[in-house]
A protein has these predicted regions:
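Conserved catalytic region of serine esterases and O-acyltransferases that act on ester linkages
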Residues: 112, 116-119, 123-125, 129-178
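Alpha-helical cap/lid subdomain in secreted, periplasmic
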Residues: 2-122, 134, 143
Length: 178
């Protein structure tokens, strides 16, 4: 796959249940980046996708790693992604985990997941997509007219605000008052 295209970006992420445990990143993250640099032109930027904490009521295996506590999992993910950005030659962080946590402070509440860990197919995925947009294009997504069919204007606004706030402050939760 790496040789198939002239990539601008190559994204990496840790498995969600391990995403807050930095010890599970190494030596694999370092080795993956080294492999990419050998097989892909240096112009391709490596980005790291920060995953999200599970829903409070998740029964997903691995949630025990965080005492089945959403904020504990979120804080661990933030620490691990911060450490990855500090110790590896990664160009950009896509803070989807922070965007999802931001959205959870809104009227969405803890409804961002459809099954306790995968994102809701509509506003959960849209919030993550908005985060990718804000970071990759280095501009606010607020006001972008695109939204999936079935979203209300308020849902669009919450998702866009959550993503923009995460792009500005990738390691802290911003309260969304909608």
């Amino acid at each position: 796959a790496l040789a198939d295209e002239d990539w601008d970006y190559i994204s990496l992420q840790q498995a969600s249940q391990l995403s807050g445990l930095y010890d599970t990143y190494q030596p694999y993250l370092h080795a993956l980046i080294a492999y990419i640099r050998v097989h892909v032109p240096t112009k391709a930027k490596i980005v790291f996708h920060q995953t999200w904490a599970y829903a409070q009521n998740s029964t997903r295996a691995g949630y025990e790693n965080y005492g089945k506590n959403q904020m504990k999992m979120y804080r661990a993910i933030v620490r691990a992604s911060e450490q990855a950005m500090r110790t590896e030659p990664i160009a950009l962080l896509i803070p989807s985990g922070t965007a999802i946590q931001n959205a959870r402070t809104s009227s969405y509440g803890d409804t961002m997941n459809r099954d306790g860990f995968h994102l809701d197919l509509l506003y959960g995925r849209y919030t993550a997509a908005c985060t990718w947009f804000a970071v990759l294009f280095r501009r606010k997504v607020e006001g972008n007219p695109y939204a999936p069919k079935g979203m209300t204007p308020q849902q669009v606004q919450i998702s866009q605000w959550a993503a923009d706030a995460a792009a500005r402050h990738p390691y802290e939760v911003t309260k969304i008052k909608l």
